[in-house]
Amino acid sequence: IQCVQKQLGISFAEMVELAKASTYTRIFDVNAARFSAPQDMRAEIKAALAETGEAPATDADLINSIYHSLAYCYGEAFRELETLIGQHWDKLYIAGGGAKNATLNELTAHYTGKQVVALPIEATAIGNLKIQMSIPEGGTV
């Protein structure tokens, strides 16, 4: 999402507003190798979507597809994790900058079937600091 945001030259808040205006919800595999470092992320995503059906017609459609695809991927990963370790959770905690994206959090709740709890953006730094403070001097994690 950051690559597309930079390519478009708009804020994340503007991206959310564009996504809300779109009804295009096609999903692509966000973990596909082709998305690791393409020359043009927008073009690569559009090409991937065109290969499996209809490509997004607008930037709003592209952004909405990205959000749906990320949330779908989170759902797949969460279900796989639950299966692998034999545990079930009702909540998914989101920390860091992404926690501010209410639209992505709503989609994540939809695709995971979990309650999404958005932690304050500072939670990532606080958790990191807590871990570092618990390591004895000269020790390792």
Show where each model-derived region lies.
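Active-site core segments that coordinate phosphate-bearing ligands/cofactors
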Residues: 1-91, 100-122, 130-140
